[in-house]
């Protein structure tokens, strides 16, 4: 699709993702799937070109509801393995019908276009053994993976759409994080959701500092993603133990994070959105692994206001809090927060009261310990600029701007990617099955968190749901 055109535009009320209030936003829906909102109606093309959020209606699921307000509609899609939702309402049922029809039409058009491209790449629509099959599954599973092949050790996270469990593969003794999403969340009762392209993006993502997908499969009611679980321990654990990292150590971790985010932004067109200390782990050699175990936490409530938040408020960028639609620069704010924690031993902004915390994030100037060097101060000041357009990395150069900052002078970025830099700390683990950095409580004994149902075996084909997810199984065994 060479020419990107606006399919529909107009005012919508958008519900805040974190502070659940409704705000008027002027939205543009384009035929390439882009769906972006502005505080005010953009008057000219230049304003429209400003980098905004990367929300796409490709492979989305649309739902209509009369709650919490009449004429509400929800757009839901999988970004990576995380369910992303946006909630809108309009004044009349007719208006809602116009918007949902336009969005569905764009989504269907993109799906058709992609299917045609897939047919073209595979040479023949009917030949399933060709390039298409290779594209979808790098190494076809020798057998169907099932839930029975894992021991279930610990609940790592639980949310509205599913859960993440630390599992051990019985055959190899290796540890993985299994993200289990409820299928009905993604397959609406009346329609088929298109999760497979997103699944393919994940399968084809290869970066040394991103958690790799090992398997994905389905049961009668769940989609399961089995991802690497690095056993060098959480960075949070190591930082709590040492209180603060040297600038050199922080530079090493920061460089690996920048390399991974650069890949997501430039190669995959994905904004990670969820960079925080808990999502950073070390592998057995001491290199960074950014995890994708995220689930929207349920019911994080602030007693004073009873507004519900999704995620960790301390890490939220100002533009996310204000619900200005946002782009790649949110990830550089997240980088600023985690690097500040590493070098200063505390969060840049903190208050137990969420309202006060948000005020600090939006208004408070950043302060540094006297011990911090000038390059580190300059880097953190740049990354923690309130205005995303002024932020380091907020321009069109994105990650390149950060790579060229003097804090990273002397870093050869190709060497970072190739893991040629020597990690400043090597975890004391002997192999990928060494559990010394795991909590003792769950390595000492196996606990069954999710006993697999009898019909969770892949051999049981659920005739009603199954056709919606053709080829939803994947194994990276060929690359392990």
From Swiss-Prot:
A single GO molecular function term of this UniProt record: kinase binding
Biological process, per Gene Ontology: activation-induced cell death of T cells; anoikis; apoptotic mitochondrial changes; behavioral response to pain; cell differentiation; cell migration involved in sprouting angiogenesis; cell population proliferation; cellular response to decreased oxygen levels
Disulfide bonds: 60-77, 296-310
Keyword Mitochondrion carried by entry: yes
Activity regulation field: Three specific sites, one in the kinase domain (Thr-308) and the two other ones in the C-terminal regulatory region (Ser-473 and Tyr-474), need to be phosphorylated for its full activation. Inhibited by pyrrolopyrimidine inhibitors like aniline triazole and spiroindoline.
Positions annotated as active site in the UniProt record: 274
Phenotypic consequence of residue 17 to K: In PROTEUSS and breast cancer; also detected in colorectal and ovarian cancer; somatic mutation; results in increased phosphorylation at T-308 and higher basal ubiquitination; the mutant protein is more efficiently recruited to the plasma membrane; alters phosphatidylinositiol phosphates lipid specificity of the AKT1 PH domain
Catalytic reaction list: L-seryl-[protein] + ATP = O-phospho-L-seryl-[protein] + ADP + H(+); L-threonyl-[protein] + ATP = O-phospho-L-threonyl-[protein] + ADP + H(+)
Effect noted on mutating residue 8 to R: Substantial reduction of ubiquitination, phosphorylation at T-308 and S-473, AKT activation as well as IGF1-induced membrane recruitment
Residues the UniProt record annotates as site (Cleavage): 462
Result for mutant: residue 312 to Y: Abolishes phosphorylation at Thr-308
Result when mutating residue 14 to A: Impairs interaction with PtdIns(3,4,5)P3 and PtdIns(3,4)P2
Outcome of substituting residue 14 to R: Substantial reduction of ubiquitination, phosphorylation at T-308 and S-473, AKT activation, loss of binding to PIP3 as well as IGF1-induced membrane recruitment
Binding site for ATP: 156-164, 179
Impact upon substituting residue 86 to A: Impairs interaction with PtdIns(3,4,5)P3 and PtdIns(3,4)P2
Residues in cross-link Glycyl lysine isopeptide (Lys-Gly) (interchain with G-Cter in ubiquitin): 284
Annotated consequence of substituting residue 25 to A: Impairs interaction with PtdIns(3,4,5)P3 and PtdIns(3,4)P2
Glycosylation sites per record: 126, 129, 305, 312, 473
Recorded consequence of changing residue 474 to F: 55% inhibition of activation
N6-acetyllysine modifications at: 14, 20
Domain PH per the UniProt entry, residue ranges: 5-108
Region (Disordered): 113-138, 450-480
Keyword presence, Chaperone: no
Disorder this protein is connected to according to its UniProt record: Breast cancer: A common malignancy originating from breast epithelial tissue. Breast neoplasms can be distinguished by their histologic pattern. Invasive ductal carcinoma is by far the most common type. Breast cancer is etiologically and genetically heterogeneous. Important genetic factors have been indicated by familial occurrence and bilateral involvement. Mutations at more than one locus can be involved in different families or even in the same case. Colorectal cancer: A complex disease characterized by malignant lesions arising from the inner wall of the large intestine (the colon) and the rectum. Genetic alterations are often associated with progression from premalignant lesion (adenoma) to invasive adenocarcinoma. Risk factors for cancer of the colon and rectum include colon polyps, long-standing ulcerative colitis, and genetic family history.
Described purpose of this protein according to its UniProt entry: AKT1 is one of 3 closely related serine/threonine-protein kinases (AKT1, AKT2 and AKT3) called the AKT kinase, and which regulate many processes including metabolism, proliferation, cell survival, growth and angiogenesis. This is mediated through serine and/or threonine phosphorylation of a range of downstream substrates. Over 100 substrate candidates have been reported so far, but for most of them, no isoform specificity has been reported.
Protein name per its UniProtKB record: RAC-alpha serine/threonine-protein kinase
Species whose genome carries this gene: Homo sapiens
